Amino acid sequence: MIKKIKKEVGCSFKENIQYMDQTLPVEKSFDIIRREMEIGGKESVFYYIDGFIKDEAMLKIMDSFLSITAEDLPQDAETFSKQKIPYVEVDVLKCFDDILRNVLSGTAVFFVDGYDAALCMDCRSYPARGVDEPDKDKSLRGSRDGFVETIVFNTALMRRRIRDPHLIMEMTEAGQSSRTDIAVCYMSDRVDKELLNNIKSRIEKLEVDDLRMNQQSLAEALFKRKWFNPFPKFKFTERPDTAAACLLEGKVVILVDNSPSAMILPTSILDMIEEANDYYFPTLTGMYLKISRTLITIATVFFTPLYLLYMQNPQWLPGVFSFVMVRDQINLPLIWQFLLLELSIDGLRLAAMNTPTMLSTPLSVIAGIVMGEFSVESGWFNSEVMLYMAFVAVANYTQPNFELGYALKFMRLMLLVLTAVFNLYGFVVGCILVLCFLVFNKTLSGRNYLNVKIN
């Protein structure tokens, strides 16, 4: 919960300005601007952040203020805001907490001698990029726009798709130092009221200094999971059409300022696996894509542990599948081969992420080919193991959720170790543990991963 300043604007102009000058580091911070001018023969002081304000808009507003005479000057701030400010977004603020928050978030606030309130003009122009297509959630047939780091742009992208008065977007904030804006979006006639109240209550009670990692910080603060539970509690998307579709299904979408993605809940593992592209094709094609992605995702968990189990018990393998047996000499136990390859694949992935864009693709290809070819020839790995690990590495990208991919990877590693140590019993126990992770893994809505009920 954010501790707010309870002091309010008084009738003394000098005391108000003195408090602002003491609170804001005007003398030390070059980007905090303090501008004095006369309006209708009375003193006024403007406060704003350099770089956030539209200079052209402020120039026109100040020019209009200079033409105000003493006879035309209204007696109170409320009347002044209605009659003398030629701008759209204007507020009258009486609490210093609201005033300071508005100044530090980029709006222009000014005091006029004789008024017991401050006037706020939202002339902000945040540095922002275009609403280009996300690099991760690419579309085959749908819209090509994506969320950006400015929260008001993101709400506009969803409002453009849902022109319904039942679409509510409530603004709140979290973080004592960061005061990060958070938008809770929902359809008032479709949302689960109990879930909505739970979410808003948790956000209001947050006691954090900042949301330095944006939505991930908010997710961890809203739902503190056990350290050994790798499964994500929220679905993230950078596509406005996906977020809008989830709103129409009765779900809650949370937007965080400075984050180019949306949090969606409640969610299940099938929600994590599905993509927006499934709905841009005919029903049969979309169903095929969903089923294929689900089966391949399941295969990434059980494929290599099952192969290891059969290699430890070759008598169980039917004759028709005898070609999958390892034919070359095994210099390194299969379990160590699998574990080393898991680590090597992560190494290649991290190297590709930290390599300059123009070099990442060729270097990844060269490294993969060279390491794969020479590691087999040198006897470190068997070619069959390399083939099956290559399938698992590629298949892991068939589902769009990065965090879910690592959760499934940890389940696969657990199965590999248990199978190598305890053979069939270890594999069975590992399968039971994976199922328990899914069944007993509760989300913020109180449902488990296998509960696909919407509302």
Locate predicted features.
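Membrane-embedded alpha-helical signal segments
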Residues: 1-306, 310, 314-316, 323, ...
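Short polybasic/polar patches that bind polyanions
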Residues: 163, 204, 349, 376, ...
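Transmembrane alpha-helical segments that form the functional core of multipass membrane systems
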Residues: 253-254, 261, 267-400, 404-413
